[in-house]
């Protein structure tokens, strides 16, 4: 009888232990389940927040599109204006460069031409002296012929470079191209007329190299 009771007690103890163990296991499983469910719910909420967009305001969208169009139009106009300005600057630069080249060429030619003028003056003086000498002797001087030929070639060359003489008489005095060396009273001439050329003047491409030295009537 005692043995039976003892066995029963032992069984009860084992059953209680088993029940306690099972409860603990159930609690652990429930806790894990609850934790997992919470995580799933949190993830769902996050996904929902990310996926579901805010309510769209179509008026704002229209305003944004209109502003973008205006900005794009302004940018296009600005770029177009910039291109036009650059083209104008390039054209002006080319014109200035061409003008500077021409100016440099004319300036170099001007200096060279001015250096030639005394040579031409000396040839003309020599020619005039020889002509007067030959009139007295009534002889043909070969030196005179050589001087004449040389002078003709010089004149031909300077004409080819755009140099022209100022040597006309009986025209109105012009202070822009004439320098009055003396004034004479001549009743046969109009007042302020070029009566005589003492030294020729020269013009290069419309620009005065040297004024003509003249005698003027009064």
Swiss-Prot record:
GO CC entries: cytosol
Chief localisation class: cytoplasm
Transmembrane segments: none
Pfam families, alphabetized: GrpE
Signal sequence, start to end: none
Keyword entries, A-Z: Chaperone, Cytoplasm, Stress response
Superkingdom of the source species: Bacteria
PROSITE patterns associated with the record: GRPE
Cell compartments where the protein resides: Cytoplasm
Stretch list, region Disordered: 1-32
Single Gene Ontology MF annotation: unfolded protein binding
UniProt-listed CDD domains: GrpE (cd00446)
Subunit relationships: Homodimer.
PANTHER family: GRPE PROTEIN, GRPE PROTEIN HOMOLOG, MITOCHONDRIAL
Family the UniProt entry places it in: Belongs to the GrpE family.
Record's function text: Participates actively in the response to hyperosmotic and heat shock by preventing the aggregation of stress-denatured proteins, in association with DnaK and GrpE. It is the nucleotide exchange factor for DnaK and may function as a thermosensor. Unfolded proteins bind initially to DnaJ; upon interaction with the DnaJ-bound protein, DnaK hydrolyzes its bound ATP, resulting in the formation of a stable complex. GrpE releases ADP from DnaK; ATP binding to DnaK triggers the release of the substrate protein, thus completing the reaction cycle.
Protein name (database record): Protein GrpE
Gene name of the encoded protein: grpE
